[in-house]
């Protein structure tokens, strides 16, 4: 006799070996989500405690960029330079942003676990497949490792073990890059990814909104944090190199700039070449790259200001080259952002996606609102010139026209006041001509015609005079 099937199964067959494996994988996935949530909460709480008990975290919250005790004379003569460090605000800000993003991804994983059960009759295997679309096992493992490595970095800095802390942070950065890339791709091809996401539109709309639009927004935020961490990663690599090799002060600046440029350019090419096929609209990486460029530039300027004489003595003009290189990195990031937005727009317009339709509707609504605002402003300006209620009407504008005709007994341009338009005097036939002559008689002189006063002129009568039709004056 077999054990009865669990409630909600599509058939009453006993559980097979495949169903048992699916249930085990489902519970393993749930445990991974729980551990990821705990690790994200722990790293966030550690940063909060470090901000409260600053005396217990001296190297983490102290002013790390103080180079006052450095012997500049030895450096000028060719001694080993002091490693370049970030200021406290940049270091702590980067760590806090990373912890907040990890916590947001943990919350997203919990929401994905809840929405994965889009049908009550869903078995463990299908629910596990839906949950993996939110976050696979490898992504959860990478997220756990990122959180714990960041906590170890903070604790090592608190105990002033600087070299080991920088090494652990480099490992944390590498794990964070893998975590963000795997979160974006889920470890599948882009065609498979799109088919799986689009297949949930009709089957599970709520879960589709989680693994579709919400995932795209979170991917942008996570990649922004990754590119923001490139500044700390470059400084950590530069510090490790300074501990193992003899660098001068200009060499320290140049090494940091080269490492940072390599990291940013490489990651931007990966975003444009691989990740853009999964999420078309990606603006977070480029914003993070520009912000990281500012962080590195600020650290270089602070280092150059404190060691001005050393840098200018050993390598004059090195800081100018560093500034130009950082400016080129920022310009490259902005250019890639423009390219990404252009390609995303062309893709959505070519395929007529819902995102493009919504953007077009938003643009039309914005234009309509702008037109309404302009018309209301124009109406308010016209209302200022309108007469107040109860005031006598003003003279119309056409009354000043010299060719205007007034009716109703008013004077026209000829001074007539008979109340009829002037064009009524134009006759159409002989009867109207005669009536017009009687109504408006003309006083003609009774004198002789003008031709009689011309001396010596006596016109001879003709049988058919030419001027017989001309009225005699």
Swiss-Prot record:
Effect of mutating residue 77 to C: In strain: Nonneuroinvasive mutant HF10
Result when mutating residue 105 to A: In strain: Nonneuroinvasive mutant HF10
InterPro entries to which the protein is assigned, alphabetical: Herpes_glycop_M (IPR000785)
Predominant location: virion
Domain of life of the organism encoding this protein: Viruses
Protein family: Belongs to the herpesviridae glycoprotein M family.
Function: Envelope glycoprotein important for virion assembly and egress. Plays a role in the correct incorporation of gH-gL into virion membrane. Directs the glycoprotein N (gN) to the host trans-Golgi network.
Protein name, UniProt field: Envelope glycoprotein M
